[in-house]
Amino acid sequence: MEEINAMNYPKLEINLRKLEHNARLEVQKLAKYGVTVMGVNKVFNGLSETASAIIRAGIDVVAESRVSNLKKLQHLPCQKCLLRTPSPSEIEEVVRYTDISLNSEVAVIQSLSREAVKQKTIHQVLLMVDMGDIREGIWFENREYLEKAVKQTLELPNLELYGLGTNFGCYGSVNPTVENGRMFVRIARELEAKFGIRFKYISGGNGTSYHLIEKGTWPEGINHLRV
């Protein structure tokens, strides 16, 4: 009976050598365009072997959408990123087990600051802007709230502004284009001018943006992808 059940379960075979090779090619290719890669370790259920493979390939930030998975990677020599906005009940663990998180709510950013002060650590915020995909982020036309979120992240103690990010090709099937990429960069530049800062990273989405690189039309200013 056990053998029959085992045969019915799906099985995922992972070639770590090929994973490392492909990740290294990705890092090298995107580096030619001035783009840094955040390695997404989703699907593998927090498997440290796959995370280690992409770290060996040159990726220094590993991202997951579950805090429980990031707990499993604490021993690895990389920064850890929660690939979504934390829920209020997760704040303590997010600050303890992650270095970076995606954020779009001022109240959550304030909670992260309070907890980071309590834990005597620094937490980095990747502030998300919704450019029409309706997946996550502050709506790009809601400039007042966006500016408030930037201001809070800059002023609250024990927080650092990791960068400005957006999503394409997810929930709303809004594909990345030269036009919306440039619009996103323009928003980033306007925020930089207002606050007298320079975003370390302007994160332009995920693997759906690859076609712009293949076409040689990569929007100037986007220097980060979550892949």
Task: Locate the predicted segments by residue.
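A charged N-terminal "starter" segment
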Residues: M1-S87, E93-T98
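Non-membrane alpha-helical structural segments and their capping/turn regions in soluble enzymes
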Residues: Y9, E13-E20, S48, E92, ...
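Hydrophobic faces of well-ordered beta-strands that scaffold small-molecule active sites
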Residues: L12, V35-N41, V62-E64, K80-R84, ...
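Active-site-adjacent beta->alpha loops and helix N-cap segments on the catalytic face
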Residues: H21, L70-L76, A107-T121, S173-M183
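Alpha-helical structural signal in soluble globular domains
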Residues: K29, A53-A57, K72-L76, E93, ...
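Active-site-proximal loop/turn and secondary-structure-junction residues that shape catalytic pockets
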Residues: V43-N45, R66-N69, P86-P88, A107, ...
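A generic, well-ordered mixed alpha/beta core segment in the N-terminal half of proteins
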Residues: I91, R96-R135
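Active-site loop/helix belt of alpha/beta enzymes
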Residues: M131-V227
